[in-house]
Every structure is written in C-alpha cells, then in structure tokens.
C-alpha cells in the first residue's frame, strides 16, 4: 500500500492566528471649522492618517470637501432643505479651516415643489465676484395664479418664459458682480436674490417658490491665508 500525505489532517500553523491591526490606531481626528458667515462654527470632525515620512497629514486634509446641512450650520430646521459644501483650505493645529465651495437642494425639497398646472422656469449663469471667484448659479421658479383667477392652470407663454429667464440672469449677474463671496453667501441664506427675482418679474407673470437652487464654484483665486483667516475670523 502506498504511503502518502493525508490531506484531511491539517497541521497547526506556526505562531498561531495573527492579530488584526486597528485601522484607527494610525489616524488622527481633526475639527472642521466653518466660516464666520454661519452661526455654528464647529461642524464636525474628520479622520486622516498620521504624518509618516514624506506623507504629511495636513496635506492629506487640504481640498477635502465636506457636505453639511444648512440647518446644522445655522441651528435652524427651516434651512434643512439646503446642503452646503465646504472645502478644507488650511490646517491650524487640530483645526481644519474651510471656505464655501458650493450649495445644492435636497432631492425631496426639489420634488415637493414640482406640481401640476404650473410652469417650471429654470436659468443658469456664470458670474464673477469682486474677489475673483467664478461661480455658476442655477435659479428655479414656478408660475402661480393671478389675483381673482378662476382658471385652474397657470401656464406662462414661451415669450414670457424667455423674458423671465433674461430677468433671472440679469439679477443673478448684478447681485454677484457687486460683492465678494462672503457677502454673496449671506444673500443665499435668507433667499434675497430669489425674492428680488419674484418682485422684478411680477409684471411679466406672477411667480412663486423662486430659489437659487444650486451654486457651483468653477474657479477660485490663488490661495491667500490672510483672506481665509478673515473669512474664518481667526
């Protein structure tokens, strides 16, 4: 009878089972600091791997983008439908200093606005602030019934939609070109631009639910620590 290895009998491994390494052991927590335009400054924490050789922890944090609800930043649930994007610009000790990097609506808010018997009007424009930020602003609006109107529908004509869109672009450009990024964000929070559009277009067709729906930063100026410190009031 041939004598060979019995594969069913397993040998014990040398050294026993290897202990699993804790993934958080080589990482550090940093505090995220929001700009001074918002009511709440400490908005959360973020993880990053510790400095090892040429790999510096602070460099791994720079340009990281955080998405935070405006309700948390303003301590007001009425702003829960807005999402604010903040980008890490610099690291001071254990604090990550951020700056505004965009804005968006939550999907549920956007869907709740769309209804039957009305016209949805959208416009977008590229604008430049006084501190050389290039932004793309998206505006959304809905038509509403005129006073004493019995008709169920409130549809705007194509010529009226074009006029409203032109007015939207004009107002967005004027508002952004006359101020810096910090002042512009201050206008977004109470929806000042939306109210101005609603007022300016009332003679063309009455509008409701006029919002700056989305803001994207296309181009930012060269990094300036002094301006960042001023924005964060540090």
Curated annotation (Swiss-Prot):
Localization, UniProt: Cytoplasm
Biased segments, Basic residues type: 1-18
GO molecular function annotation: structural constituent of ribosome
SMART domains given in the database record: Ribosomal_S3Ae
GO CC, alphabetical: cytosolic small ribosomal subunit
Keyword flag Ribosomal protein: yes
Disordered: annotated span: 1-20
Record keywords: Cytoplasm, Ribonucleoprotein, Ribosomal protein
Family: Belongs to the eukaryotic ribosomal protein eS1 family.
UniProt protein name: Small ribosomal subunit protein eS1y
Organism listed in the record: Vitis vinifera
